[in-house]
Curated annotation (Swiss-Prot):
Belongs to the UPF0346 family. NCBIfam families: PRK13672.1 (NF010193). SUPFAM superfamilies: YozE-like. It comes from Lactiplantibacillus plantarum (strain ATCC BAA-793 / NCIMB 8826 / WCFS1) (Lactobacillus plantarum). This is UPF0346 protein lp_1865. InterPro entries: UPF0346, YozE_SAM-like, YozE_SAM-like_sf.
Length: 73
């Protein structure tokens, strides 16, 4: 994996979309504390569980993580 999860997630931003991953990306962009340099699933998951009230369900993160892994393959 060469790019960080945050870098990947920013490619999914779309302010006009109602797609769950796009909304996650839009909100993560506004989250000043998001761990932008992380490539670690557990670190990101823990951060989101404790701090990301904007994420309606962790399934959205899981789906975004799988897309991230696929993009790095």
């Amino acid at each position: 994996m060469h790019k960080t999860f945050y870098t990947f997630l920013m490619t999914q931003r779309n302010p006009d979309s109602t797609d769950a991953i796009a909304e996650f990306a839009n909100n993560a962009f506004l989250d000043q504390s998001f761990p932008k340099q992380s490539k670690d699933f557990h670190e990101l998951s823990q951060y989101l569980e404790l701090n990301a009230g904007y994420l309606p369900t962790m399934t959205v993160f899981d789906d975004a993580w799988q897309a991230y892994l696929a993009s790095e393959a």
